[in-house]
Swiss-Prot record:
Protein name (database record): Polymerase acidic protein
Species the sequence originates in: Influenza A virus (strain A/Puerto Rico/8/1934 H1N1)
Keywords (A to Z) from UniProt: Cap snatching, Endonuclease, Eukaryotic host gene expression shutoff by virus, Eukaryotic host transcription shutoff by virus, Host cytoplasm, Host gene expression shutoff by virus, Host nucleus, Host-virus interaction, Hydrolase, Inhibition of host RNA polymerase II by virus, Manganese, Metal-binding, Nuclease, Phosphoprotein
EC main group: hydrolase
GO MF annotation terms: endonuclease activity; metal ion binding; RNA binding
Cofactor binding comment, as recorded: Binds 2 manganese ions per subunit.
Residues the entry annotates as binding Mn(2+) 1: H41, D108, E119, I120
Record-linked HAMAP family: INFV_PA
UniProt-annotated location(s): Host cytoplasm; Host nucleus
Keyword Phosphoprotein assigned: yes
Ranges spanned by the short sequence motif Nuclear localization signal 1 (NLS1), renumbered to the chain: 124-139
Motif Nuclear localization signal 2 (NLS2): positions: 184-247
Length: 716
């Protein structure tokens, strides 16, 4: 039969039939009769439409091939033979332009003259039986049905045959020829008997055995069988029933289900106010490193030794002064704290043996910066039960902040490549089980795309700082320990490199509960002048501490070196998660893997190699005001990683709430794009829930602005 089909039908029709069967997961080598039936149906649809046009006067005319008027409008739009997504797009566009009612099932054609969808049937049985099955399935007065048989019979809605006698005769003759050709090859009987009735997927899906018992047991009360329940669900009209049930609950409750259309959603309202400020625990794009290559000094690997060695590489120190004060802080104390660090590091160098850790003297400036003795005294509740006006002290509502451009710049920078590698190949962790070839191949490809990414540097920096701070918090609870902020990487040539970003001084850290806070002062090197974006640095006091010679296109230039100082705090649970930041690599690898899986299932083979090595292909990486941005697979890996890393660096209750609530709206919009006709109730309440998370957090505000870009393009 397969050979017959390939000889008998036009190659384009055969190819479309192959695609259709693949889309529905059917094997044409096994289902050969189905293959022949699909080709026949496609050919009838094309013949139905051939030569029929509409002229300038809106009349239907027949134009044979080679006629000079071939630029006329086609009378029929062919829907059959397109892939499902495209077919629904065509149907929706017809409904929008003509006002036709949207059909429940995909029809085969649209007739622009009669303004109606047409369902074409080709049957090997009695035409009237097949006609009734079709009518029963589509249950729509609006869709016109036209059935042809291989014996030359036909049947159409209200005996309206749409086409002229000659066009229909052409179709009948072709069907008769196909039947004769099959019969002469001994294929007809099997083909005729193989036709099943018009079935929907649900009807064909028989539930038997244990599953059937479970289905019957799990019905809602008052339903005796699955059939009863199905019939009830099929005929269910949601609005009245749900409203009725709700009105029994409370007078205030109503939930009328409103259709969710393209015009329904509005953009999220982002707050107004002063621009938002940087709130990460360490500097990101603005950080500056003092580095040593191929470290081999005594005590290499001991943080304090490494830090001192890095500090010695810089000779441009100068008398520090405040260039951007902290509005609410005592800025001279920040200045004195830095001078104290320099002085105490100098003292260490003068000692014969450098100690492994350094505890700072508890000076007044450090006590102030670390909030020593600032916490209100805790009193046992039993001792003050009788106090009349006992209350929790008032806290102000957080001030609303607007989105600032710096956070998008931070994100863009995080996606970029640096000239160093921040992870070794095995950083993502070996699999415990005997590793599959595909899994390790994917991991190696992914690692090579992200190992040089700036977001990966942030991961390693975050892991180091949080580990060091948690260790010190447990080991030296009462001390103001000096903790260098260090990272390690490899240069392009494979040489090891140790980097110093600055220092942290931790405060008292008697951390009993996971959420108990340890205060710390961070002091970080930078070449960024804070006066360019003062709003970003609201929480910092910035000092100018030296001049650095930078190699540039015009030779060496001297640039001022700044120190960004601020008081900050963290907790055991936050440090625990900070130490686990490598998980971001795993999360983004899994996202990439699901993209590869989707591609592989379409192509029916593993596409890992093609996915990473086909440099010409682009993939969507996100939405911007310009539309959907596309880029190389490497950029997609790095963008997904950066998103995951920023979710960790800027973790907050606002982000938790925004992610959970905006996801609901996202799913509704996606359902609309997939033509699933979603309905909603209390959409206003959903918007409220999303927008109450838009307060002042830079990362949440950026995500909300991306979400608005998505809404614009998804619905345009």
């Amino acid at each position: 039969m397969e050979d017959f089909v390939r000889q008998c039908f036009n190659p384009m029709i055969v190819e479309l039939a192959e695609k259709t069967m693949k889309e529905y997961g059917e094997d044409l080598k096994i289902e050969t009769n189905k293959f022949a039936a699909i080709c026949t149906h496609l050919e009838v649809c094309f013949m139905y439409s051939d030569f029929h046009f509409i002229n300038e006067q809106g009349e239907s005319i027949i134009v044979e091939l080679g006629d000079p008027n071939a630029l006329l409008k086609h009378r029929f739009e062919i829907i059959e033979g397109r892939d499902r997504t495209m077919a629904w797009t065509v149907v929706n566009s017809i409904c929008n332009t003509t006002g036709a009612e949207k059909p429940k099932f995909l029809p085969d054609l649209y007739d622009y003259k009669e303004n109606r969808f047409i369902e074409i049937g080709v049957t090997r049985r009695e035409v009237h039986i097949y006609y009734l099955e079709k009518a029963n399935k589509i249950k729509s007065e609006k869709t016109h049905i036209h059935i042809f048989s291989f014996t030359g019979e036909e049947m159409a809605t209200k005996a309206d045959y749409t086409l002229d006698e000659e066009s229909r005769a052409r179709i009948k003759t072709r069907l008769f020829t196909i039947r004769q050709e099959m019969a002469s090859r001994g294929l007809w009987d099997s083909f005729r008997q193989s036709e099943r009735g018009e079935e929907t997927i649900e009807e064909r899906f028989e539930i038997t055995g244990t599953m059937r018992k479970l289905a019957d047991q799990s019905l809602p009360p008052n339903f005796s069988s699955l059939e009863n329940f199905r019939a009830y669900v099929d005929g269910f009209e949601p609005n009245g029933y749900i409203e009725g049930k709700l009105s029994q609950m409370s007078k205030e409750v109503n939930a009328r289900i409103e259709p969710f259309l393209k015009t329904t959603p509005r953009p999220l309202r982002l707050p107004n106010g002063p621009p938002c400020s940087q709130r990460s625990k360490f500097l990101l794009m603005d950080a500056l490193k003092l580095s040593i290559e191929d470290p081999s000094h005594e005590g290499e690997g001991i943080p304090l030794y490494d830090a001192i060695k890095c500090m010695r590489t810089f000779f441009g120190w100068k008398e520090p002064n405040v260039v951007k004060p902290h509005e609410k802080g005592i800025n001279p104390n920040y200045l004195l704290s830095w001078k104290q660090v320099l002085a105490e590091l100098q003292d260490i160098e003068n000692e014969e043996k450098i100690p492994k850790t350094k505890n700072m003297k508890k000076t007044s400036q450090l006590k102030w910066a670390l909030g020593e003795n600032m916490a209100p005294e805790k009193v046992d509740f039993d001792d003050c039960k009788d106090v009349g006006d006992l209350k929790q002290y008032d806290s102000d509502e957080p001030e609303l902040r607007s989105l600032a451009s710096w956070i998008q710049n931070e994100f863009n920078k995080a996606c970029e490549l640096t000239d160093s590698s921040w992870i070794e190949l095995d950083e993502i962790g070996e699999d415990v089980a005997p590793i599959e070839h595909i899994a390790s191949m994917r991991r190696n490809y992914f690692t090579s795309e992200v190992s040089h990414c700036r977001a990966t540097e942030y991961i390693m920096k975050g892991v180091y700082i949080n580990t060091a701070l948690l260790n010190a918090s447990c080991a030296a609870m009462d001390d103001f320990q000096l903790i260098p902020m260090i990272s390690k990487c490899r240069t392009k040539e494979g040489r090891r490199k140790t980097n110093l970003y600055g220092f942290i001084i931790k405060g008292r850290s008697h951390l009993r509960n996971d959420t108990d806070v340890v205060n710390f002062v961070s002091m970080e090197f930078s070449l960024t002048d804070p006066r360019l974006e003062p709003h970003k640095w609201e929480k910092y006091c910035v000092l100018e501490i030296g001049d650095m010679l930078i190699r540039s296109a015009i030779g060496q230039v001297s640039r001022p070196m700044f120190l960004y100082v601020r008081t900050n705090g963290t907790s055991k649970i936050k440090m625990k998660w900070g130490m686990e930041m490598r998980r971001c690599l795993l999360q983004s690898l899994q996202q990439i893997e699901s993209m590869i899986e989707a591609e592989s299932s379409v192509k029916e083979k593993d596409m890992t190699k093609e996915f990473f090595e086909n440099k010409s292909e682009t993939w969507p990486i996100g939405e911007s005001p310009k539309g959907v941005e596309e880029s190389s697979i490497g950029k997609v890996c790095r963008t997904l990683l950066a998103k995951s890393v920023f979710n960790s660096l800027y973790a907050s209750p606002q982000l938790e709430g925004f992610s959970a609530e905006s996801r609901k709206l996202l799913l509704i919009v996606q359902a609309l794009r997939d033509n699933l006709e979603p309905g909603t109730f209390d959409l206003g309440g959903l918007y409220e829930a999303i927008e109450e998370c838009l307060i002042n957090d830079p990362w949440v505000l950026l995500n909300a602005s991306w979400f608005n870009s998505f809404l614009t393009h998804a619905l345009s």
